[in-house]
């Protein structure tokens, strides 16, 4: 899901779970007294407010406050906050993609959260790291998503699934005939291609010892990245990927081929579970395959979070609400309503959640995933990298030439737009 990726996927993920006991910190009687009569506004994702209905009611009763929930597309909320926040019509708590955190913090749109270590320790390392900027916490993980492998059980059984990407290439050579295909992926986009490139040593940004990103160290054109791109190019060059899945509309073509039973397997995310189910496809879901070097294909973890607006006039109570919404009990309840995989570690073994094949696949793949870089400089990577990979896919440039140009363009844009930080 292109919007989710660059806000970015299903995010789907880090291993997660939760126990039934709520873990939000108790508020003192004086704090409760000061909150009496207050009103908080929460911006929740579209068609997801039912997942927090009970939590909101409980919070209202305990704190004697009114909480108004407004649904907005989570990937667009930061845009609305830029206008509505200063105008006094914005939220106290909002939800947003983890890879937007850095930009939001740089623009002064979010409040730093001050929560106890035991609250932070509830969540998977990757998900909580996505909420950190300069070692400061700006959100609590709500849900995770990452890319996984969907396969059509009527075309290929679980036992027949190739174990490596190279084996999928061989399988596709035998089955693709121009109208039907074996394995498909949107490898002309860095969000998906990074799964292959990083397996051979490529990376987006290098990291310092403290885990922070170094935007001056770009690895999308190193030797490993080029090797991964060369493997990707084979799928297009040999006619195993149709031209229709290249470019902005590629995702629609890829999904249609799968729902029409014309592709045995595709890389997608949990955001398509409902659509594929409604299409009547007899599908299975599993983690991504390995590479020939024995490494697992990685993926970006998309993390949705609860954050406190810098414009909130009741930031202490807003933080209480964010902690409450993201606690163990409420995370599990939200999963039961929305099927979004929570980021709480204990959920990794929760039977109620692990009975879902999609949740199991996201949890397993999350072991090999990394958060989408959340620094503002990431905005300068997407377009040059995607453009380069499209020239690789169409055969207009060799991988090294294309990726060298992408890295050079990204470095120039970072210098021009971010050097004054």
UniProtKB/Swiss-Prot annotation:
Single GO cellular component term: ATP-binding cassette (ABC) transporter complex, substrate-binding subunit-containing
Lipid moiety-binding residues (S-diacylglycerol cysteine): 23
Membrane topology: Lipid-anchor
BP-aspect Gene Ontology terms: maltodextrin transmembrane transport; maltose transport
Phenotype seen when the gene is deleted: Deletion mutant displays a 2-fold increase in the doubling time when galactan is the sole carbon and energy source.
Keywords: Cell membrane, Lipoprotein, Membrane, Palmitate, Signal, Sugar transport, Transport
Binding partners and assembly: The complex is composed of two ATP-binding proteins (MsmX), two transmembrane proteins (GanP and GanQ) and a solute-binding protein (GanS).
UniProt family annotation: Belongs to the bacterial solute-binding protein 1 family.
Protein name per the record: Galactooligosaccharide-binding protein
Biological source species: Bacillus subtilis (strain 168)
Gene that this sequence comes from: ganS
């Amino acid at each position: 899901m292109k919007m989710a990726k660059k806000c970015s996927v299903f995010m789907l993920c880090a291993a997660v779970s939760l126990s039934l006991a709520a873990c939000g910190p108790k508020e003192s009687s004086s704090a409760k007294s000061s909150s009496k009569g207050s009103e908080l506004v929460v911006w929740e994702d579209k068609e997801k407010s039912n997942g927090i209905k009970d939590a909101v009611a409980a919070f209202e009763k305990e704190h004697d406050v009114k909480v108004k929930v407004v649904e907005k597309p989570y990937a667009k909320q930061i845009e609305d906050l830029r206008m509505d926040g200063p105008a006094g019509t914005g939220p106290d708590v909002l939800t947003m993609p983890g890879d937007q955190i850095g930009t939001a913090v740089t623009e002064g749109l979010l409040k730093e959260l001050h929560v106890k270590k035991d609250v932070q320790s509830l969540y998977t390392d990757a998900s909580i790291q996505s909420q950190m900027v300069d070692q400061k916490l700006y959100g609590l993980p709500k849900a995770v998503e990452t890319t996984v492998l969907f396969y059509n059980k009527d075309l290929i059984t679980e036992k027949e699934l190739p174990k490596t990407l190279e084996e999928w290439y061989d399988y596709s050579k035998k089955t693709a005939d121009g109208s039907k295909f074996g394995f498909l992926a949107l490898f002309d986009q860095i969000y998906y291609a990074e799964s292959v490139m990083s397996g051979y040593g490529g990376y987006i940004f290098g990291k310092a010892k403290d885990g922070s990103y170094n935007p001056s160290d770009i690895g999308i054109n190193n030797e490993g990245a080029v090797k991964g791109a060369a493997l990707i190019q084979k799928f297009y060059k040999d006619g195993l990927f149709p031209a229709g899945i290249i470019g902005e509309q590629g995702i629609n073509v890829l999904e249609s081929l799968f729902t029409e039973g014309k592709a045995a397997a595709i890389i997608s995310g949990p955001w398509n579970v409902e659509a594929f189910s409604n299409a009547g496809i007899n599908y299975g879901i599993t983690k991504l395959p390995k590479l020939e070097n024995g490494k697992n294909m990685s993926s970006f973890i998309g993390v949705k979070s609860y954050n406190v607006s810098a414009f909130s006039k009741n930031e202490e109570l807003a933080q209480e609400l964010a902690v409450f919404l993201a606690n163990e009990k409420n995370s599990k309840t939200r999963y039961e309503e929305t099927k979004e995989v929570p980021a709480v570690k204990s959920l990794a073994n929760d039977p109620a959640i692990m009975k879902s094949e999609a949740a199991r696949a996201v949890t397993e793949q999350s072991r090999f995933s990394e958060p989408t870089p959340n620094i503002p400089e990431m905005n300068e990577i997407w377009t040059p990298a995607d453009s380069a990979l499209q020239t690789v896919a169409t055969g207009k440039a060799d991988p090294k030439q294309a990726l060298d140009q992408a890295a050079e363009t990204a470095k120039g844009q970072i210098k021009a737009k971010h050097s004054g930080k």
